[in-house]
Amino acid sequence: MPKRTDIRKIMVIGSGPIVIGQAAEFDYSGTQACLSLKEEGYQVVLVNSNPATIMTDKDIADKVYIEPITLEFVTRILRKERPDALLPTLGGQTGLNMAMALSKNGILEELNVELLGTKLSAIDKAEDRDLFKQLMEELNQPIPESEIVNSVEEAIQFAEQIGYPLIVRPAFTLGGTGGGMCDNQEQLVDITTKGLKLSPVTQCLIERSIAGFKEIEYEVMRDAADNALVVCNMENFDPVGIHTGDSIVFAPAQTLSDVENQLLRDASLDIIRALKIEGGCNVQLALDPNSFKYYVIEVNPRVSRSSALASKATGYPIAKLAAKIAVGLTLDEVINPITKTTYAMFEPALDYVVAKMPRFPFDKFESGDRKLGTQMKATGEVMAIGRNIEESLLKACRSLEIGVDHIKIADLDNVSDDVLLEKIRKAEDDRLFYLAEALRRHYSIEKLASLTSIDSFFLDKLRVIVELEDLLSKNRLDINILKKVKNKGFSDKAIASLWQINEDQVRNMRKEAGILPVYKMVDTCASEFDSATPYFYSTYAVENESLISDKASILVLGSGPIRIGQGVEFDYATVHSVKAIRESGFEAIIMNSNPETVSTDFSISDKLYFEPLTFEDVMNVIDLEKPEGVILQFGGQTAINLAKDLNKAGVKILGTQLEDLDRAENRKQFEATLQALNIPQPPGFTATTEEEAVNAAQKIGYPVLVRPSYVLGGRAMKIVENEEDLRHYMTTAVKASPDHPVLIDAYLIGKECEVDAISDGQNILIPGIMEHIERSGVHSGDSMAVYPPQTLSETIIETIVDYTKRLAIGLNCIGMMNIQFVIKDQKVYVIEVNPRASRTLPFLSKVTHIPMAQVATKVILGDKLCNFTYGYDLYPASDMVHIKAPVFSFTKLAKVDSLLGPEMKSTGEVMGSDINLQKALYKAFEAAYLHMPDYGNIVFTVDDTDKEEALELAKVYQSIGYRIYATQGTAIYFDANGLETVLVGKLGENDRNHIPDLIKNGKIQAVINTVGQNNIDNHDALIIRRSAIEQGVPLFTSLDTAHAMFKVLESRAFTLKVLD
């Protein structure tokens, strides 16, 4: 079937900000789809609120709107653009839910907009739990015994009929949001209440738990001619009961018999055909390990996290082909872009094993509930490719960047057997390491299988690794054993640890013995056809398939898995850097380990190495490719952390040199640099012991800001107000030592702003200055940033530009740099300098129209700023106002406190742009799903130090129609100062009128809660904040943010004035 000619303009809805359950995979799929549609000659209009994505670059679609993905704004854009069709299946759950809302509100019908890819009826049947149940019954596909409920009472009734355990699955939600497993009525009531609240259609499916079955996924494609194929099947290491996004996953499935595979494959193809999906679809199934009995768990009628994984695992570009199918092309007439000789109708074949491992945020959220269940908690993932399970698993392990290079974590030797077995039974994020430890202690596979329901096949593979550890320990420096363990994916570092020598010695010994990796191609066809894909993975085999060209090459290191503090912004910078390298006439090579991102799309670079970002793996690629140099600036802390070892190994690092990186990161050197340049900074000291820290704080005076050196995202950063808290921090939060000093700084309360700049060693370009709405004390990644600055005087701006120039030249920066300033009493202080790309780079690139990563890359390669058209120093400011606002995933992370502070907690960002600050703020809040009505009730429960400022804020909220509720201390202060309030209780104050109840009953429209440093662990305040998050009520833990929201509400209100 030829492509359709009756449609000309297509609108694509993106997935919005990155949250747990919906990460960079939609940037990858959305980018692919937009380019694929443009390739076919269609005009593409894109709507997405996330500025950190490649997808929202001007050249990806014909028209790009970075606007809130809400009914109000998408409808406005539809009315303005009048597209012929809408493609919602590439924007994750956000895109699907928006399509449903547009349809239900009659917008699509009114504007005569056709839905492409997956029809509304199919979305409804897959997402509406009742319709899905009916369809499965019609197809004779087994599903667990279940009931659709719209109230808690109905859920209890069903539970009384069939008993526990049960699983709650809310309709139309993402990543298992609001769902969970229940073993009793109390848990059922709690989870169903949250689930109904979070489901846009107030509906939950309550089903009999089949936890313990094998979880298998099939990624399937279908076109309008009813051609259908399986792209890839995948098997979860963890059984049903743990969200697939939180599970280790292998592709292809490892333990299925031919009969089982055929059974599940037929079911998946029957389902996609019955739903008449045109494009990609993910089917999740549960298989009884002891019979051929299976159940259909869920169907995602769209491109998903699993399809991004399947695309990267096979090389088959699902999103690109889904877009072509959506406009009428069929699988048997589209050429497979990898082989360039076969058609897309050929099912991919794999001659390797892929392992995906989730990356959890618990290194930042130590108080978080680590127990895994049906609600997703991972922020990102890594993928590794090997010739056997052991190899791919160990490569994935060391890709995670959690301080491990093997399936062993520190201090497990000291864990008692009781604790060990409890950790294995409980299924937390680190269970894999405890399983390996149990095998080291000779627990039987049968025992571990019965505790976990993990297939014995996988446990046996772990036992192979453990037995090889033992073999290594008993045969020190044995070359044959070395060869054997390298084949199974052991790292040089792990071997060195077992042999009690250093990593360099293992590396040299291995190289002398000729034990070197070769690189194999990912070609979709297990080498059956010729393929020209420049997509490689390492293994210890015979033939090397990565041929080195004569062209000079540059290696760019990516940023690894998405985690809090290092998100998709760094992938954005990596992709742009590669573009500039290619434009400069070099061969661009990317090395990265993240399957979700655009940078690991093989069409982006001249060569892609899908490998862990460790010294060993990077050096192996460098030894083979012999690049002109390596660019580290765009890979976040991941790449920067490799600088020292690469430099020592003689690798040419391009851009700012190691000694200058050190001068910015090393406290003493940095202080000396600032003093030499005559630039003020808050007084501070470095401490390597508890006593040193206490002495430093006494000299500076409390409060002080404490943090470890060399971290990203403010990890373990804290504001400390007294000696007791400081001693507690030094003994629990960090392990200070001469190698790992702790920085102690005076905490200045003032206005914070930051600058991204490009330096060529002689001149600098500052695309823009960003002013933070929240004052210092809230991490810059969690602050709302405004460009251009709205309240900075010309003198302050000139000072910032002057200090930036001095620092760029004084630190010999070549390429990108980010500087953070605090302004107190009209004096500018430098807080920190990062001589690399920062997370604000995509936002600033979008709003200034300067492709910063590209300019910086060309400068790194030797170009000068005078050869560009952007001039020097501060670039002229935009006449629009642009706001970058953080987005959080607290609903997914029970027990994580939503109070903002110096440690970063946001997972993503949105952007709001308009002609003035109030309108831009309105858009930013709407895009971040922080919506407040024009009137209602607002609760104030604030710290004593904030009461005076909070009073003024409460007065202005009252002036626009809000009723002020306050807890006792706040209410007494407000009443004494002439502001009438409604007194509310916190908790346990023998009063029905307490805040969590009021929030639950819909009586409260917003909560303003601030806490002094000495009361951070206040239990009542924690529960109030948690209640607001769970019920979706706007929560402000900074008065500055609450004031920004007031500006929005005020701008929407009319002035009501008594006649004089």
Swiss-Prot record:
**Name of the molecule in the record:** Carbamoyl phosphate synthase large chain
Cofactor(s) annotated in UniProt: Mg(2+); Mn(2+)
Q: Mind telling me which PROSITE patterns this protein's record contains?
A: ATP_GRASP, CPSASE_1, CPSASE_2, MGS
**Can you tell me which residues bind Mn(2+) 1?**
Q284, E298
UniProt binding sites for Mn(2+) 2: E298, N300
Tell me the ranges covered by the ATP-grasp domain, including all copies.
Answer: 133-327, 671-861
Instruction: Report residues binding Mg(2+) 2.
Output: E298, N300
How does this chain assemble? Answer: Composed of two chains; the small (or glutamine) chain promotes the hydrolysis of glutamine to ammonia, which is used by the large (or ammonia) chain to synthesize carbamoyl phosphate. Tetramer of heterodimers (alpha,beta)4.
Residues the entry annotates as binding ATP 2: R707, A746, L748, E752, G777, V778, H779, S780, Q820, E832
- Name the species this protein comes from: Streptococcus agalactiae serotype V (strain ATCC BAA-611 / 2603 V/R)
Keyword list, A-Z: Amino-acid biosynthesis, Arginine biosynthesis, ATP-binding, Ligase, Magnesium, Manganese, Metal-binding, Nucleotide-binding, Pyrimidine biosynthesis, Repeat
